[in-house]
């Protein structure tokens, strides 16, 4: 069940389906990432819209490990700048330039929805 929800999450994320994402998230979802900690569905969606406004952002789950209510995902994240970006995570990018990140996402589920997301870089 949780693997199905994770696959739906990535499908919605990559399809720019904010409503689909919202339906998968708990109202008080917590997102912890390089951009800090956001709490609540609206805060998550604001971060999502910021990222997808700056980049064509395609996240591909490479490995999915389910352990009860926690799912750990190894992610290949391809970010292509839509315009020149002076500073993103300490880097400047020109329009059309791609940044590839290897990430780990840890997703915690509660009542059939994603309640916590922690995204960390992999070496």
Model region roles, listed by residue range:
Residues 1, 49-123:
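A beta-strand edge to alpha-helix "cap/lid" segment located at domain peripheries
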Residues 1-16:
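Short, aromatic-enriched amphipathic alpha-helices that serve as compact interaction elements
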Residues 5, 17-28, 32:
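Short, well-ordered alpha-helical segments enriched in acidic and aromatic residues
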Residues 9, 20-21, 29, 40, ...:
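Hydrophobic pocket/interface hotspot
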Residues 10, 33-36, 63-65:
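Structured beta->alpha junctions
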Residues 15-16, 23, 37, 43, ...:
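Short, flexible segments with low predicted structural confidence
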């Amino acid at each position: 069940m949780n693997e199905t929800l994770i696959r739906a999450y990535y499908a919605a994320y990559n399809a720019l389906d904010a409503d689909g994402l919202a339906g998968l998230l708990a109202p008080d979802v917590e997102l912890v990432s390089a951009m800090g900690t956001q709490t609540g569905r609206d805060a998550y969606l604001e971060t999502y819209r910021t990222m997808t406004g700056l980049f064509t952002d395609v996240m591909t789950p490479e490995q999915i490990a389910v352990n009860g209510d926690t799912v750990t995902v190894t992610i290949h994240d391809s970010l292509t700048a839509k315009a020149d970006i002076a500073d993103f995570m300490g880097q400047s990018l020109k329009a059309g330039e791609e940044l590839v990140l290897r990430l780990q996402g840890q997703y915690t589920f509660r009542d059939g929805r994603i309640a916590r997301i922690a995204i960390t870089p992999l070496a």
